[in-house]
Amino acid sequence: MNFLQRNLFTKLRADNFGTKEEMEPMTTFKKKKIAQMLKNVNDVPAGEVKMNNGFLNRRLSKIQEDEHHAIDTSIETIYLLRIIVANVNGMLANGINLRGIIQLGDYLRTRGDKVDFVKLEKWIAKLRIQRIAQLEGSVLITFFDFEQDEIPFVHHIERGAYKLTLRSLYYNIMDQQAIQFEQTSSGFVRTTGGTMRKNLRRSMRYLQYAPIETMSNFMNNFFRSLSEIEE
């Protein structure tokens, strides 16, 4: 990490997890840069609590419905699952959402003792999001000084957590445009401004962590944008 990145995470840890760290001294120019980076962090939209794949989304609904009627129901475990799923959805759309990761870390530390992690791991396996959930936990370990035993669903630290997280610091709303199509005078349809390429490249970053969700997210965006032409 460079100087600005180190100071940013020092501030995020101090503000959200009560560490006593202090940022290294900065010039006025660098303070403005940190302020912009914090704005970028806050500007990344939160993800919805839904799966991009229709079959998996129905499975998510069933998991929640069944748990509410279970004898040993665990609302805390359901809530943690919802945080993880929202982060997955947001990640595929906009990159790693540090606000969502911080929410995950805060919940683990304040309510983690109430969570049934055996049940949670069964659910994330059913939803095919084991590795991308592990990626979320790896961000907490890599940047927020969490211990691996605080996050039972992390069985090894994902190496990609470092690079993908630093990339998210430079989020720009203009980089997250949906795929755009235009109809030529001859009636053919084509994408504009390289939006197809940008969306595909963004999706490919997470393909190894959640293949079904990643491809479903890309195809949903593709057909949603195409339908706008027809309208």
Residue ranges of predicted features:
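Conserved NTP-donor binding/palm subdomain of two-metal-ion nucleotidyltransferases/polymerases, i.e.
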Residues: 1-231
